[in-house]
């Protein structure tokens, strides 16, 4: 007798860990940069360059890209951009890690502070967070039937249907988007870009035949110095569509996507945004090269009939079992919540207008409850304002806006795998009377919840002649009174009788029994 087996291809997170570390650096201004009068804006971004798994540890090498905008009193531009990167190398202890493991590392800046030591020297302090995950592709070979020899003769076996989520496609790729953004005619030509921010909104992925459709929005903000004697400071903000397709061999419309994405940053922590001439040779076009780093997982749900148990009627059939684990999609959920807040500005000068606002959604705490996945965190908000101060008209303020939200996922447990992706879908900051900021935001959260299903898998079976003493010890006829948990299968196994025979003998319509129910068993019936 041989088992018919089916291979099931799946993935799981083997282990994960989070570390924090600090970076501090005193930075001297390059000779070609004018003296600092006051600091205005700063931001930091983690750029991961290399991930090296080892024994019980992972080495991560990367850079902290920074951009600092400051005021100067020297002749020329009123605002100056200073950008660069600080290298780092960190070891993350992860017990059980092997050099052959596949490790994914995400880096975020928890806090980035710039202090002015003097007009030519700055102190940079940053708190960085690294999240490492060992992702494992694994296969389970499970029995789905029996064949050969005396299969089916004197043998009872139980087949149970199970919903399984198989991994169909697993790969990393990059989706690139090039766009030329012309300035409106009312805007002056660009001399140099002082500050920029590129962010993604409403990004979606849809499987198609042999390709993956990408759609969403790209929000672009630039603060620039205009051409001309006055060198005026202007800002421009726009939203452009993100759409296109990515070749994906084996992709089909019915597959379920779980795709993690991030915007590829340059060394200084920003996407590439350049000044380009228009057809008249004037510097009026912003050239954007946007790249999305994609971690692609495409799944397929399938119902598979699995051989769960087997016993012999005329012989001993002994199953050899092992522990196995299957993956099952519990839910693909997207939820949105509105966040509103009022914040008093602490700028020091009367504010004339809010020029630009940007934010990052952080998840500080994630907890599984009866209602679903409870999330707590904040919007790390940066607001650029124009003030009445003619010497330093541009001032920024940073705020943390708290939120709490529960993703409604029925039946989720703490042992289930659920990585939540957060996104700032909408952000609006208005200036109220009394130097107060009115903040309105829409946050979007999405997750794919995978349930782990442990089971005993039959690896093989051993056939032996049945002990004659066992058969002799069975009664010729007996009225069996069902105990809690009994069914026709457990009774048939105990008395070496076919389930169908017991069912027909007792005129039963199902194999389920209620406690105390009487079942007639007659030895020798087949």
Task: Please identify what each model-predicted range represents.
Residues 1-474:
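Membrane-lipid interaction segments
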Residues 491:
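Short alpha-helical "recognition helix" segments of helix-turn-helix
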Residues 497-526:
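Extracellular LysM carbohydrate-binding repeats and other cell-envelope/extracellular binding modules
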């Amino acid at each position: 007798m041989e088992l018919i087996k089916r291979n099931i291809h799946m993935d799981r997170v083997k282990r994960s860990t989070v570390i924090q570390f600090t970076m501090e650096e005193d930075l001297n201004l390059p000779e070609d940069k004018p003296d600092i009068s006051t600091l205005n804006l700063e931001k930091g971004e983690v750029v991961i360059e290399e991930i090296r798994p080892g024994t019980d540890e992972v080495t991560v090498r990367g850079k902290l890209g920074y951009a600092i905008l400051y005021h100067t009193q020297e002749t020329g531009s009123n605002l100056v951009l200073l950008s660069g990167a600080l290298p780092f190398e960190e070891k993350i202890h992860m017990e059980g890690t092997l050099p052959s493991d596949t490790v994914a590392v995400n880096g975020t800046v928890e806090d980035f502070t710039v202090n002015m030591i003097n007009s030519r020297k700055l102190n940079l302090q940053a708190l960085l967070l690294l999240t490492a995950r060992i992702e494992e592709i694994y296969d389970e070979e499970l029995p789905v039937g029996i064949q050969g020899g005396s299969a089916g003769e004197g043998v009872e076996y139980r087949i149970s249907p199970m919903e399984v989520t198989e991994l169909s496609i697993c790969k990393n790729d990059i989706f690139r988007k090039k766009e030329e953004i012309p300035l409106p005619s009312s805007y002056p030509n660009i001399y140099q870009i002082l500050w920029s921010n590129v962010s993604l909104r409403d990004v979606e992925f849809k499987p198609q035949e042999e390709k993956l459709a990408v759609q969403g929005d790209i929000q672009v903000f630039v603060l620039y110095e205009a051409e001309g004697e006055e060198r005026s400071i202007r800002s421009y903000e726009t939203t452009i569509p993100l759409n296109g397709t990515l070749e994906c061999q084996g992709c089909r419309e019915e597959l379920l996507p779980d795709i993690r994405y991030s915007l590829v940053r340059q060394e200084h922590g920003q996407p590439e945004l350049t000044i380009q001439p228009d057809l008249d040779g004037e510097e009026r076009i912003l050239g954007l090269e946007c790249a999305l780093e994609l971690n692609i997982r495409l799944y397929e749900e399938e119902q598979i009939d699995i051989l769960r148990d087997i016993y012999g009627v005329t012989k001993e059939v002994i199953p050899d079992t092992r522990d196995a684990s299957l993956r099952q999609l519990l839910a693909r959920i997207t939820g949105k919540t509105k966040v509103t807040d009022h914040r008093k500005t602490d700028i020091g000068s009367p504010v004339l207008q809010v020029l630009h606002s940007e934010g990052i959604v952080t998840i500080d705490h994630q907890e599984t409850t009866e209602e679903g996945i409870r999330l707590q965190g904040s919007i790390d908000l940066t607001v650029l304002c124009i003030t009445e101060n003619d010497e330093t008209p541009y001032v920024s303020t940073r705020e943390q806006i708290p939120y709490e939200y529960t993703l409604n996922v029925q039946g989720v447990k703490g042992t289930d795998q659920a990585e939540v992706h957060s996104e700032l879908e909408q952000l609006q900051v208005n200036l109220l009377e009394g130097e107060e900021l009115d903040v309105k935001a829409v946050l979007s959260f999405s997750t794919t919840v995978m349930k782990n299903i442990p089971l005993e898998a039959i690896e093989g079976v051993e056939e032996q002649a049945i002990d004659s003493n066992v058969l002799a010890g069975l009664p010729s006829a007996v009225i069996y009174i069902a105990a809690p948990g009994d069914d026709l299968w457990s009774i048939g196994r105990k008395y070496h009788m076919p389930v169908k025979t017991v069912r027909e003998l007792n005129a039963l319509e199902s194999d389920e029994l209620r406690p105390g129910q009487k079942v007639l068993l007659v030895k020798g019936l087949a």
